[in-house]
């Protein structure tokens, strides 16, 4: 449930133009983004300068909002900026800085691969499970059950496959194992 009574940031990542295929899961169109801004009430959205001023001076009010864009993705500029401009809104634009330390975030590549080569996330997940040889009993343990309850509470739009995938990626496989499975799937596509 969306809470109207606390100050917070609305964080966004991926966007695509309406009428085009999303390049990754969770991507929004300009129409959906516009609807979200209207739903939360555009008049409640503060500029980054005003947000920082209120934080520094302990003047942030119940219900104040700011908009943030993470990872410096091109779709944010191409799609979301036109909606911000329409309402003369400003946002925090956070760059993806880990490239300065370790290179490309492969998850961005994997996201594009999944949405480009599979008709659904469930079909991808089935192939992922087969390729990774993860036993289905993994999802019967208490660690997974706790993870599932947390994820479904925080992200009620996630499917069972989404949650299972994230558990495997984050906890069941080492990074090198996860990347190996993804690379194998990409090479066999």
Question: Where on the chain are the PLM-derived regions?
Answer:
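Residue-level detector of anion-binding/catalytic polar loops
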Residues: 90
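Extended, charge-rich helix/loop segments that form flexible
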Residues: 103-189
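Membrane-embedded segments
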Residues: 76-80
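N-terminal pre-catalytic segment of deacetylase/amide-hydrolase enzymes
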Residues: 1-65, 85, 95-127
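Noncatalytic alpha-helical scaffolds and linker/capping helices
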Residues: 70-71
């Amino acid at each position: 449930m969306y809470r109207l009574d606390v100050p917070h940031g609305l964080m966004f990542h991926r966007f695509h133009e309406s009428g085009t295929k999303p390049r990754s899961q969770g991507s929004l169109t300009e129409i959906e983004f516009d609807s979200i801004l209207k739903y939360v009430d555009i008049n409640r959205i503060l500029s980054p300068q005003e947000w920082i001023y209120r934080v520094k001076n302990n003047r942030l009010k119940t219900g104040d909002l700011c908009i943030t864009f993470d990872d410096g993705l091109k779709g944010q500029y191409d799609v979301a900026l036109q909606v911000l401009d329409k309402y003369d809104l400003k946002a925090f634009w956070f760059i993806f800085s880990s490239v300065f330390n370790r290179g490309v975030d492969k998850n961005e590549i994997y996201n594009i691969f999944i949405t480009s080569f599979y008709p659904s996330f469930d079909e991808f997940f089935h192939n992922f499970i087969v390729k990774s040889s993860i036993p289905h009993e993994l999802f019967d343990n208490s660690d997974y059950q706790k993870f599932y309850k947390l994820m479904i509470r925080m992200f009620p739009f996630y499917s069972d496959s989404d949650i299972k995938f994230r558990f495997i990626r984050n906890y069941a496989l080492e990074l090198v194992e996860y990347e190996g499975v993804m690379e194998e799937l990409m090479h066999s596509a």
